[in-house]
Regions:
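Generic recognition of long tandem-repeat/solenoid scaffolds
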Residues: 17-30, 77-79
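Short, small-residue-biased leader/transition segments that mark boundaries at the very start
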Residues: 2-12
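Active/ligand-binding-proximal structured segments within catalytic/core domains
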Residues: 23-57, 67-68
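Histidine-acidic residue clusters that define the catalytic metal-binding segment
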Residues: 136-151
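Generic alpha-helical propensity signal that fires on short helical segments
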Residues: 44-48, 62, 95-99
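Active-site-adjacent, His/Asp/Glu-enriched structural segments that form or flank metal-binding
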Residues: 68-140
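Short, ordered beta-strand-loop transition motifs
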Residues: 12-22, 70-73
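Glycine-rich, N-terminal phosphate-binding loop and its surrounding beta-alpha-beta segment
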Residues: 42, 50-66, 74-88
Length: 151
């Protein structure tokens, strides 16, 4: 079942400058907007926790990660990184992150009343499934047509 997702979109939807630093916003579209069902909040929330944990601990990107979180429409995620980066620059990072999410077992990091305002809204099984789907249908065979944001 092929996904008409835009993949990584135009990896930088935009770039913003904060002082001398460039912040690049990446559009990680996991479902095809207005064509297929959106992701449920529980799996989106789980992917957010796992993705943020992965990025905060990544040897190369932990100091470049500004934000990772869901789109309000629940079709994907935004990743904000410090630096003038292209979509091709982050494909290996996205593969690594979504493999981490696909393979993750155990307690979801930060899923406790002390750390999260909605810690019961988690679905690890669906997060694993959606990460695998994104890897198989988008990231593993990504080409230039999925790395440029459609006009």
């Amino acid at each position: 079942d092929d996904v008409e997702s835009r993949g990584l979109g135009d990896v930088y939807k935009r770039q913003d400058h904060i002082g001398a630093e460039v912040i690049t916003t990446f559009d990680l579209r996991m479902t095809s907007p207005n064509e297929e069902p959106v992701m449920n909040t529980a799996e989106v929330h789980t992917i957010e926790h796992l993705g943020a944990t992965f990025l905060r601990n990544h040897p190369e990107y932990k100091d470049k990660t500004v934000y990772f979180g869901p789109m309000g429409c629940r079709t994907g995620f935004y990743l904000l990184l410090a630096g003038d980066l292209s979509s091709k620059d982050i494909v290996p990072l996205m593969v690594e992150m979504f493999e981490f999410i696909r393979d993750y077992k155990g307690e979801v990091p930060g899923a406790s009343p002390k750390d999260c305002g909605n810690y019961l809204d988690m679905n690890l099984g669906m997060a694993n499934y959606l990460a695998k789907r994104y890897l198989d249908n988008v990231l593993y065979n990504i080409d230039d047509s999925r790395l440029v944001y459609p006009e």
